[in-house]
Amino acid sequence: MEGTCFLRGQPLTTIPSLPSRKGFLLQRWKTNRIVRFSGFKNHSVSGKSRSFDLSLRASGPIRASSVVTEASPTNLNSKEEDLVFVAGATGKVGSRTVRELLKLGFRVRAGVRSAQRAGSLVQSVKEMKLQNTDEGTQPVEKLEIVECDLEKKDSIQPALGNASVIICCIGASEKEISDITGPYRIDYLATKNLVDAATSAKVNNFILVTSLGTNKFGFPAAILNLFWGVLCWKRKAEEALIESGLNYAIVRPGGMERPTDAYKETHNLTLALDDTLFGGQVSNLQVAELLACMAKNPQLSFSKIVEVVAETTAPLTPIEKLLEKIPSKRPYVPPPKASVATKEVKPVPTKPVTQEPTAPKEDEAPPKEKNVKPRPLSPYASYEDLKPPTSPIPNSTTSVSPAKSKEVDATQVPVEANVVPVPDSTSNVPVVEVKQVEEKKERPLSPYARYENLKPPSSPSPTASSTRKSDSLSPGPTDSDTDKSSTVAKTVTETAVATSVTETSVATSVPETAVATSVTETAAPATSKMRPLSPYAIYADLKPPTSPTPASTGPKEAASVEDNSELPGGNNDVLKTVDGNLNTIPPSTPEAVPVVSSAIDTSLASGDNTAQPKPRPLSPYTMYADMKPPTSPLPSPVTNH
């Protein structure tokens, strides 16, 4: 029943009385005038009540619409967990939310203003095909259409029924932009009336759909405030829900005008914290799926404010996991109904009967637990046939034998003690293990003391290595070592001197032997104090490299020079190469040269033994008989004719 009329001029003060109407009431608020008619004579219908709302606008028509609500008794103490009330069920988001709830197995009470406008919703539900449905049940059977006007507080309570969850999807229509009171009446006042009714009905969960940018100013979401401050009124509705004390969940979706249902095939859903997003798009179907998931999992959506958009770069993630990442404003508190039901089920008469015969068993249980505490950590103590890996046991060696015998005994003790798997024997095992730990302190650090066949790496030891051993092992040399080293030094020096004596002359043999004996006598105390630097004194078979011994450089060298030179005075040439002077000197006697060379040879021989060749000649020509110094051609003497 609808009627329209126009009002012009001054504000309305009186309306002619109608014969068939009683209780005429006129209310005025700002520029909007609401005329309410209540009570009819002889038009009452059992179980139904009719009311007419007449909205008066300054420059628009007056519409009178009748809303029929079926009154149903409600029990505040009992709520049906599978029953959900959806406000705004004929809208874009509400109709899809109803279908998603039916897919999850919920029973839905769809709140609409007019049952005639719910025909498309009922037809879409009939075309649904549920995957998991009981035999003989259809989705339409779980749907209830309830006519209710949220601007009237009296009609909301009967429409809720025993619903445990309320989903509010209402909002001012974008088509009625000229209605400046739309955001206030629908987005705030109607939502607040629904919150108050839900509080009095003590519902378990309330889910509210608002928009991005309701709390914090941000572009481009703030542009919506040009539509008569719609974001401000939505924020007022959120505050009313938060202050009510209900278990709430607030969903702030992005733009839903352009995206279609196929939008989810290319764009995945993303959730963000409150006051973080100010732009983005999401489809109505994706928002409906989120609302249905929140109704099914109240512990995941408890006291959360979620902002929803869809992006192509976002990964495909289940909604449950996305909700887990959003923190809750307060800790989750389960509904009291579940706790009462569990308390009634727990006391069963059969439980105390089963506990009486088990009472003596509980007395026997404590000693078993005490025996389990000293359980050995080694698995070899639990099995008789299982032996620990053993290494080859060496024979007794010097001072390490007592420690090895202790360790061998310690490894054999747990095997004998665990022959019978009795809990008493296991208690003795830890005592043996403690002894092993204490005895390990006496273990030698060297592995060569453990195994007989294992020898340390050794270098080849020489035959006469007394001096080397005395230096490395003993603190100082002994008398026997000094005697051996002195004899070796004597043999070396005597052989060197003998070769030089045979080649020079018999006259020089006496001083050479004297020099050799003096060298050996002086070298003997040196070997007792310091280690010889030459390796040839250590090994008997090792000989030093020998160079060809030159012949005596006495009269032979002088004779050869005179014979080869064309002019007399060949000795002058030899002395010239040695001294570097061209002056002639008288020739020396042939006996003086061998004496000098023998002195040089003896000094060289003594220098080889003492490693101090002080009188060694600078010229190499005196050492070798066949080696001659270079000679320059001498000019012939000039004769005066």
Swiss-Prot record:
* Residue spans of biased composition, Basic and acidic residues class: 359-372, 435-444
- Give residues where N-acetylalanine occurs: A64
Its subcellular locations are:
Plastid, Chloroplast inner membrane; Plastid, Chloroplast stroma; Plastid, Chloroplast thylakoid
Extent of Low complexity compositional bias: 393-402, 485-528
- Specify the superkingdom: Eukaryota
- Summarize the protein's role: Involved in protein precursor import into chloroplasts. Part of the redox regulon consisting of TIC32, TIC 55 and TIC62. Acts as a membrane anchor of LFNR1 and LFNR2. Has a NADPH-dependent dehydrogenase activity, but only after preincubation with lipids.
Give start-end positions of Pro residues composition bias.
630-641
Instruction: List ligand-binding residues for NADP(+).
Output: 84-113
Q: What stretch of residues directs this protein to its organelle as a transit peptide?
A: 1-63
Q: What is this protein called?
A: Protein TIC 62, chloroplastic
**What PANTHER family does this protein map onto?**
PROTEIN TIC 62, CHLOROPLASTIC
Subunit note: Part of the Tic complex. Interacts with TIC110 and TIC55. Interacts with LFNR1 and LFNR2. Component of high molecular weight thylakoid LFNRs-containing protein complexes containing LIR1, LFNR1, LFNR2, TIC62 and TROL proteins.
Q: Where is the composition biased (Polar residues)?
A: 599-612
NAD as a keyword?
yes
The species this protein belongs to is Arabidopsis thaliana (Mouse-ear cress)
Main localization is plastid
Tissue specificity comment:
Expressed in cotyledons and leaves, but not in roots.
